[in-house]
Amino acid sequence: MYQLQFINLVYDTTKLTHLEQTNINLFIGNWSNHQLQKSICIRHGDDTSHNQYHILFIDTAHQRIKFSSIDNEEIIYILDYDDTQHILMQTSSKQGIGTSRPIVYERLV
């Protein structure tokens, strides 16, 4: 059975450059890792009070974003854009103690 995680990125588009918005949009969509039976749904919006995450850092040069849950800021998530079909996701603690191995996700069509 697949584990499904929803990620609702909450941010103010008026405070971002066009390049930063484009970088975020690379990650919007549905992604899956069939081997680990994990899926994630990444979207923009605060239309729900659940699974809300705020963006901490946008690295447009490396197509990477860092974000954390509004409810638990101790865990930091890092998304790296690999290509149009793949992203990498890893977690780290706010104190910088340890980082998980990246998990590769494939875009679901």
UniProtKB/Swiss-Prot annotation:
<comment type="function">
    <text>Specifically inhibits the cysteine protease staphopain B (SspB) by blocking the active site of the enzyme. Probably required to protect cytoplasmic proteins from being degraded by prematurely activated/folded prostaphopain B. Also involved in growth capacity, viability and bacterial morphology.</text>
</comment>
<protein>
    <recommendedName>
        <fullName>Staphostatin B</fullName>
    </recommendedName>
</protein>
<keyword id="KW-0646">Protease inhibitor</keyword>
<keyword id="KW-0789">Thiol protease inhibitor</keyword>
<dbReference type="GO" id="GO:0004869">
    <property type="term" value="F:cysteine-type endopeptidase inhibitor activity"/>
</dbReference>
<comment type="subunit">
    <text>Forms a stable non-covalent complex with prematurely activated/folded SspB.</text>
</comment>
<dbReference type="Pfam" id="PF09023">
    <property type="entry name" value="Staphostatin_B"/>
</dbReference>
<dbReference type="GO" id="GO:0005737">
    <property type="term" value="C:cytoplasm"/>
</dbReference>
<comment type="similarity">
    <text>Belongs to the protease inhibitor I57 (SspC) family.</text>
</comment>
<keyword id="KW-0963">Cytoplasm</keyword>
<dbReference type="InterPro" id="IPR037296">
    <property type="entry name" value="Staphostatin_A/B"/>
</dbReference>
<keyword id="KW-0843">Virulence</keyword>
<feature type="region of interest" description="Binds to staphopain B">
    <location>
        <begin position="97"/>
        <end position="101"/>
    </location>
</feature>
<dbReference type="InterPro" id="IPR016085">
    <property type="entry name" value="Protease_inh_b-brl_dom"/>
</dbReference>
<dbReference type="InterPro" id="IPR015113">
    <property type="entry name" value="Staphostatin_B"/>
</dbReference>
